[in-house]
């Protein structure tokens, strides 16, 4: 369906165009008036004589010939809806103010309350403080009453100023509050965006770091496995798990072991892991590593038992410094013995024999020293046993 637009022009519009007369849409066109003819009424006499507004509206409608039948045939009614309630024309009523401007002034009571509110808020803390100190209107002298009067005068002048310039300062406060609210809003949005960006960046950094570490561990594990290091990584992981279990049991109180011993054993695993990262260890078999670890633990246990026995024998207790010294000693001894055993297999097995030979050599040296002292004493005694006659003969010769 083609929509054609026809201008809404009535016969009255054409008449006004011809006569160059302006028509008041509210009152309608001016009918012809003939003063000589008594039958002709003056303009708008019908509306003046009618007291009912509805009848006036009907007369105006008749003057305009307002009816839907005047609509062009091809005009779409949806474009300009026309109400037909009592054949009334569209509402063309315009509000007219007698003064011409809207009254924006606030009521007197509201101005009074709002102007007094700042003074009240300013004085409430002072009154509360003086009441708390029990100094409100108590033991006031001349100076105190003068100060009180000056303060009341200041408050009164402030109240009068606020009341007189109510419109100005309320607008200023309103603008300031809106500005501060916008600043807070912008700041909150900016901080939220910063937090969001920081969180996303941190998450990406953590993700990249975890992926990189996983790749490094994978590369190291594959490299160690391909380099025929028999179960080295597996042994280290198992050893770390054992150390964590021991630490957890000691901390929980379900296992009573020497903390220094546990520290030393865990230090071995840490040193082993460091060397594994460098990939500079020889080919250690599972049997060799287990024997080395257990032998080191045995030596450390012997050291701990001897230390505890001596402390118990002399009725001494090890304080925190003593435990630190013991842990440091076991750390050095444990790592030295472990790596010495790894580099020289069987060194710990030969150690008792070496210690025994050393002790035997030391005791043999002591025995030889005592033998030399005995021989010297014996030689001195032999010189004292020479006969007196032989000594005289020798003197004569």
UniProtKB/Swiss-Prot annotation:
<feature type="transmembrane region" description="Helical">
    <location>
        <begin position="108"/>
        <end position="128"/>
    </location>
</feature>
<feature type="region of interest" description="Disordered">
    <location>
        <begin position="65"/>
        <end position="102"/>
    </location>
</feature>
<comment type="similarity">
    <text>Belongs to the WTF family.</text>
</comment>
<dbReference type="InterPro" id="IPR004982">
    <property type="entry name" value="WTF"/>
</dbReference>
<dbReference type="GO" id="GO:0005774">
    <property type="term" value="C:vacuolar membrane"/>
</dbReference>
<feature type="transmembrane region" description="Helical">
    <location>
        <begin position="266"/>
        <end position="286"/>
    </location>
</feature>
<feature type="region of interest" description="Disordered">
    <location>
        <begin position="1"/>
        <end position="41"/>
    </location>
</feature>
<feature type="transmembrane region" description="Helical">
    <location>
        <begin position="205"/>
        <end position="225"/>
    </location>
</feature>
<keyword id="KW-0812">Transmembrane</keyword>
<feature type="transmembrane region" description="Helical">
    <location>
        <begin position="290"/>
        <end position="310"/>
    </location>
</feature>
<comment type="function">
    <text>Promotes unequal transmission of alleles from the parental zygote to progeny spores by acting as poison/antidote system where the poison and antidote proteins are produced from the same locus; the poison component is trans-acting and targets all spores within an ascus whereas the antidote component is spore-specific, leading to poisoning of all progeny that do not inherit the allele.</text>
</comment>
<keyword id="KW-0472">Membrane</keyword>
<dbReference type="GO" id="GO:0005737">
    <property type="term" value="C:cytoplasm"/>
</dbReference>
<keyword id="KW-1133">Transmembrane helix</keyword>
<feature type="transmembrane region" description="Helical">
    <location>
        <begin position="357"/>
        <end position="377"/>
    </location>
</feature>
<comment type="subunit">
    <text>Homomer. Forms protein aggregates. The two isoforms can interact with each other and with themselves. High sequence similarity is required for their interaction.</text>
</comment>
<feature type="transmembrane region" description="Helical">
    <location>
        <begin position="145"/>
        <end position="165"/>
    </location>
</feature>
<feature type="transmembrane region" description="Helical">
    <location>
        <begin position="230"/>
        <end position="250"/>
    </location>
</feature>
<feature type="transmembrane region" description="Helical">
    <location>
        <begin position="320"/>
        <end position="340"/>
    </location>
</feature>
<dbReference type="GO" id="GO:0005789">
    <property type="term" value="C:endoplasmic reticulum membrane"/>
</dbReference>
<dbReference type="GO" id="GO:0072324">
    <property type="term" value="C:ascus epiplasm"/>
</dbReference>
<dbReference type="Pfam" id="PF03303">
    <property type="entry name" value="WTF"/>
</dbReference>
<keyword id="KW-0256">Endoplasmic reticulum</keyword>
<keyword id="KW-0926">Vacuole</keyword>
<keyword id="KW-0800">Toxin</keyword>
<feature type="transmembrane region" description="Helical">
    <location>
        <begin position="175"/>
        <end position="195"/>
    </location>
</feature>
<keyword id="KW-0963">Cytoplasm</keyword>
<feature type="compositionally biased region" description="Basic and acidic residues">
    <location>
        <begin position="11"/>
        <end position="29"/>
    </location>
</feature>
<dbReference type="GO" id="GO:0110134">
    <property type="term" value="P:meiotic drive"/>
</dbReference>
<protein>
    <recommendedName>
        <fullName>Meiotic driver wtf28</fullName>
    </recommendedName>
</protein>
